[in-house]
Amino acid sequence: MTQGLPAQPFNPIGIHAMTLSRRQFIQSSGASALLAGIGRQAWAQALDSAKIIAGFAPGGTADTVSRRVADKLHPGYAKSAVVENKTGAGGQIAIQFVKTAAPDGATVLLTPMSMLGIYPHTYKKLPYDPVADLTPVSAAAVFEYGLAVGPMVPASVKTAPEFLAWCKVNPALANFGSPAAGSAPHFIGALLGRAGNVDLRHVAFRGTQPAILDMIGGQIAAVCGPSGDFSQHLAAGKCRLLATSGGVRGKFTPGTPTLTEQGFRDLAFTEWFGFFLPARAPQDVVQRLNSGIRAALASQDVIDGLALSYLEVMPTSPAQLAAMLKSDTERWGPLVKAVGFTPEG
C-alpha cells in the first residue's frame, strides 16, 4: 500500500525534540517556581502593547493558540496583547508582516512549522528566509492532523482505506481541502492518495475552518487539517474523523485509529506552533518574551483551553526551537521531492 514512498519509515516531525523538552520543562520548572522567577525580574522596559500575528483565519488552531496566550501573556512583557489575523498566501503574508516590523518586541509571529520548515522546499521565490528574517522565541504547542469527511461521503465510509476506495469509484468527487498549498496537511493528503493509487485532487484554502465549512456544506469531500479544528463539527455530527496522523493514537482522539494503524506506515506526523520575533531582536527582549510565554503556557486555564482544541502545551528555549526548526526543515526535503510538488501545482 505504501509503494512509491520513501524506503525508510518517515519519522514523526519533531516528536523527538518535542517530547524531551516538554518532559524537561515539567520536571525542572513547576508553574509556581516559574512565575516566582518572572516576578523577580525587572520589568522597566515592559511594552505598552504587543501584537501577536497569526497567518490563518479566526477560529482555527493558530488563532486559538494566539488568543489563549495573548489573554495570559505576563503583564511584565506588555501591558496588553492583541491578536491580528493576516491571512493569505498560505501564511506568508503574516510572516512578511513580522519580517518587516521593528525588532522591538511589539510584533510577535505565531506560526506552525509548515510555513518555515516546508515552504523553503516548495516555493522558489519565498519572500522570507525562515532563519535570517526571524528570531526563535519559544514553541507553544504540539498537535496532530486528522482526515475528516463530510456529507458528500456516504456514512458507510469509516476508514481512510474505505475513503480511498470510494474515491476510486467516484473519481469526479475525489478531492480534499487543506489550510494552504504546500502545508503539511496538503502533503499528508497527497501522500495518502499516492499510497492508495488514487488521484486525490487538492483544494487549497486560507485556513482550515473555511475548508471545513465547504466540506460540511457538501462542496468538497474531505479535509486534512489539525485534528482539533474538527472538534466542534464532530460534536455536532457534521463530519466524521477517519484517521489521525500521530505515531500513536492521539490523547484527545483515542477512538480514532492512526493512518499507520490503517496500513500507511510512512504517514506518521505531528507538528508544532512556535513564537518568533523579527530578526535582530535584542536578546533581553527575546528572553523576556520567552519568560512571558512560558508563564502563559503554565497557566491551567491555557492548558485546559488548548486541550479543547486537541493541543498540548510545549514551551521551549529559543535554542531548542531553533534546533527543532532545523531538524524539521532537513527532514521535509526528501518528502516534498517524493510528492513532486511545485509552486505552480
Where are these regions (language model features)?
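Short, Lys/Arg-enriched N-terminal segments with co-localized hydrophobic residues
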Residues: 3-17
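An extracytoplasmic/periplasmic, membrane-proximal ligand-sensing/linker region
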Residues: 13, 45-49, 194, 261, ...
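N-terminal secretory signal peptides and thylakoid transit peptides that target proteins
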Residues: 16-33
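N-terminal (or domain-start) structured segment
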Residues: 43-132, 173, 197-222, 233, ...
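Hinge/capping helix and adjacent helix->loop/strand transition within the periplasmic-binding protein
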Residues: 100-106, 121-210, 259, 272-305
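A ligand-binding cleft/hinge motif common to bilobed small-molecule-binding domains
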Residues: 114-125, 191-195, 222-256
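C-terminal lobe and pocket-closing loops
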Residues: 142, 230-298, 327-330
